[in-house]
Amino acid sequence: MRYPIWRVGVFIAAAVWPLFWLYEAWSAVLGPDPGKVLVDRLGLGTLILLLITLAMTPLQKLSGWAGWIAVRRQLGLWCFAYVVLHLAAYCVFVLGLDWSQLGVELRKRPYIIVGALGFLLLLVLAVTSNRYSQRRLGSRWKKLHRLVYVVLGLGLLHMLWIVRADLKEWAIYASIGALLLVLRIPPVMRRIPRLIAKKPLSATKA
């Protein structure tokens, strides 16, 4: 396994936050509705991990270090783990496992439908994020995994619908997402290695 320390570091960093939040909830420091806080934090954690995952390829192009790509799939699977925890926390703390309330929630809060669509797409991507699926799907695998940008759009819409009034934090994540999308445009992507390659030449001339 390449970059084992890097991979272990990513594992610890991703695993520690849900455990820390659970500890905070158990310690009664999350306010009067700790369950709702957990749901929100896990949802935001999912979005942040998705953005970090999408940043791995541009970072590899910019730096030339293969370690970014080495943890990309790991980060993607952690993103899926977070969204599963987000959904589980919603079912336990918001619905109270009362499935009869789900229809009421869907009518009152249609952003839940948007979130559910994002979850289903992430499920497909997680299930096919292995070498067997890559071999079976061939060139279609890359096309399928471009759905991650649809997931990003759904995640941002889901968050926008929830926050509504205070858009400052949402605007930060949306801007990062937009930048990552621009960096994946083929002409822009092709220019990144050239920009890096020009740096030593410029330094030599100076």
From Swiss-Prot:
Q: Which domain of life is it from?
A: Bacteria
InterPro entries on file: Fe3_Rdtase_TM_dom (IPR013130), MsrQ-like (IPR022837)
One GO molecular-function annotation for this sequence?
Answer: FMN binding
Which Pfam families does the annotation name? Answer: Ferric_reduct (PF01794)
Q: Has keyword Electron transport?
A: yes
GO cellular component: a single term: plasma membrane
Q: Give the UniProt record's GO annotations in the biological process aspect.
A: protein repair
Membrane topology is:
Multi-pass membrane protein
**Cofactor descriptive note:** Binds 1 FMN per subunit. Binds 1 heme b (iron(II)-protoporphyrin IX) group per subunit.
Q: Which cofactors does it use?
A: FMN; heme b
How does this chain assemble?
Answer: Heterodimer of a catalytic subunit (MsrP) and a heme-binding subunit (MsrQ).
| Listed name of the protein | Protein-methionine-sulfoxide reductase heme-binding subunit MsrQ
Supply the source organism for this entry: Pseudomonas fluorescens (strain SBW25)
Origin organism lineage: Bacteria, Pseudomonadati, Pseudomonadota, Gammaproteobacteria, Pseudomonadales
